[in-house]
């Protein structure tokens, strides 16, 4: 399942992460993340996977269903923010 812009924003909000924090965790530039979140660019598959992995390490679980698209599971968090 490919991560969506909505899921990225929702996950960041659940974790109370800034774009700067997520970008650093995913190994990408903050302006790149901003462009992705604002729909100005479509991330390469490797970039989308890096973002997804960074969020999952912090306890985000992504779902295939319509709503909610992700939730926080503290038990799955490898990194606490």
Which residues does each predicted region cover?
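DNA major-groove recognition helix of helix-turn-helix/homeodomain DNA-binding modules
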Residues: 27, 46-63
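A detector for short, charged/polar N-terminal pre-domain segments
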Residues: 1-3
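Short polybasic/polar patches that bind polyanions
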Residues: 13, 24, 56
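Short basic helix-loop element that most often maps to the first helix and adjoining turn
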Residues: 6-21
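Recognition helix of helix-turn-helix/homeodomain-like DNA-binding domains
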Residues: 28-43
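Helix-turn-helix/homeodomain-like alpha-helical modules used for DNA recognition
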Residues: 60-81
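Conserved hydrophobic/aromatic packing and binding residues within compact polymer-binding modules
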Residues: 8, 22-23, 33-36
């Amino acid at each position: 399942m490919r991560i969506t812009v909505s899921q990225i924003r929702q996950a960041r909000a659940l974790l109370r992460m800034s774009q700067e924090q997520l970008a650093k965790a995913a190994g990408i530039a903050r302006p790149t993340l901003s462009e992705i979140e604002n729909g100005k660019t479509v991330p390469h598959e490797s970039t989308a996977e890096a973002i997804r992995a960074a969020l999952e390490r912090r306890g985000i679980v992504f779902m295939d269903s319509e709503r909610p698209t992700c939730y926080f599971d503290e038990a799955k968090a490898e990194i606490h923010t």
